[in-house]
């Protein structure tokens, strides 16, 4: 007798609560038929720093993805801003670091998308960049067929000095059958959309370790230069031209080291890295908050952002208190995303692939549908408190902390036109 048959008949009183002959079967093959459609990619246009407006042509009925292809898009778009307009009204806008440092680490809706990291820390494919508006992920779309009197436009604000040539913008278009197309054109629609809001604040850091590490780095550079000088001086025969040139380098490195050491010795932190950041200007039901700064290189100790503890307060009442950096990355991703990147540098208490931390009001940040929000429009005040903030020694002496809020809004489409229902 097979052990599987023994298992099958070995049922008792407790199993009444678990199984029934009338229950759901795991062995029914079910599927749903869908309406007829087709899809195809189309080249929208080539852009450069001199041609930054992309008018979306109506090549199909729906648009469900927009992306760029080119050479070294990471450096071309670094520091850029991407803004979406419908009928001349700005619907959404975000900086490059939202798509390079935040979206893949905290909001990706598939594993494949979460692995497509392109920032100064990790580069999967620098020749590809996808846009992340309310359409393009989670099988969402924008119904171009219903916008007979409004055009869709994407504007790019490149960073000063950026070089961008022969960048191709593509879109993925959906083509519908006549009956479903008629439904889109005749029906008023209220579409849930996401938007990005942003606040910037000069960051107060405890730079004691920052200046100590700068002095150590300057000392190492001086020692390396001096070692090379000694090797040149003991060479036989000596090269006086090379010795004189290296001596000048050593003198410069010594002066830089002495200056760095003097700065480190004299430095005292005026605030101990305490930051009280007002975020009351955010509006609408917010699903997620992100705070940090743009990743500028892969070596974490040179580039990191960390703090001892953080609070979030709403209407003067603590929502959370004295939470660690680990909580705002590992715990948030572990509990609130399906595909978040959880890697973390324990020595510097900083995420490995981003310099942003997160807090989610929602249950599932990867989902397009609402699973929880905090309506900032109904708050009198809100703030984030960061204590003992520290940064990597190759960051600028003065850094801006960037806080993003991802909120929900409603895009109403009616009679060939569209508009955002709730303004700021």
Language-model features: locations:
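Short, low-complexity Pro/Thr/Gly
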Residues: 1-209, 262-424
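Extended amphipathic alpha-helical heptad-repeat regions
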Residues: 205-263
């Amino acid at each position: 007798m097979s052990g599987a048959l023994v298992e099958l008949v070995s049922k008792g009183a407790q199993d009444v609560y678990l199984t029934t002959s009338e229950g759901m079967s795991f062995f029914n093959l079910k599927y749903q038929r869908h309406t007829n459609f087709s899809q195809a990619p189309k080249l929208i246009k080539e852009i450069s720093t001199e041609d930054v407006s992309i008018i979306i042509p109506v090549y199909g009925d729906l648009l469900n993805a927009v992306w760029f292809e080119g050479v070294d898009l990471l450096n071309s778009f670094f520091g850029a801003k991407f803004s979406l307009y419908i009928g001349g009204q700005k619907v959404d806008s975000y900086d490059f670091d939202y798509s390079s440092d935040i979206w893949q680490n905290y909001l990706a809706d598939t594993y494949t998308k979460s692995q497509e990291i392109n920032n100064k820390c990790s580069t999967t494919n620098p020749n590809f960049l996808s846009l992340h508006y309310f359409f393009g992920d989670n099988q969402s779309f924008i119904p171009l067929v219903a916008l007979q009197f409004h055009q869709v436009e994407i504007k790019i604000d490149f960073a000063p000095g950026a070089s961008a040539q022969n960048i191709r913008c593509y879109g993925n278009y959906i083509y519908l059958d006549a009956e479903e197309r008629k439904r889109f054109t005749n029906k008023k629609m209220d579409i849930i959309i996401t938007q990005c809001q942003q606040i910037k604040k000069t960051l107060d850091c405890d730079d004691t370790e920052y200046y100590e590490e700068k002095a150590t780095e300057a000392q190492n550079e001086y020692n390396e230069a001096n070692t090379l000088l000694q090797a040149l001086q003991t060479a036989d025969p000596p090269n006086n031209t090379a010795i004189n040139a290296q001596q000048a380098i050593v003198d410069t490195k010594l002066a830089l080291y002495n200056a760095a050491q003097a700065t480190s010795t004299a430095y005292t932190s005026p605030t101990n890295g305490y930051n009280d950041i007002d975020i009351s200007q955010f509006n609408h039901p917010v699903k997620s908050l992100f705070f940090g700064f743009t990743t500028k290189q892969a070596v974490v100790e040179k580039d990191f952002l960390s703090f001892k503890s953080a609070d979030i307060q709403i209407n003067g009442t603590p929502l959370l208190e004295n939470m660690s950096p680990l909580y705002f990355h590992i715990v948030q991703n572990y509990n609130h995303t399906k595909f978040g990147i959880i890697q973390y540098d324990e020595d510097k208490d900083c995420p490995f692939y981003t310099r942003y931390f997160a807090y989610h009001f929602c249950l599932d940040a990867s989902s397009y549908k609402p699973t929880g929000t905090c309506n900032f429009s109904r708050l009198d005040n809100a703030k984030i408190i960061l204590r003992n903030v520290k940064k990597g020694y190759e960051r600028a002496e003065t850094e801006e902390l960037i806080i993003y809020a991802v909120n929900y809004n409603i895009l109403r489409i009616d009679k060939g036109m569209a508009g955002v229902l709730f303004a700021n």
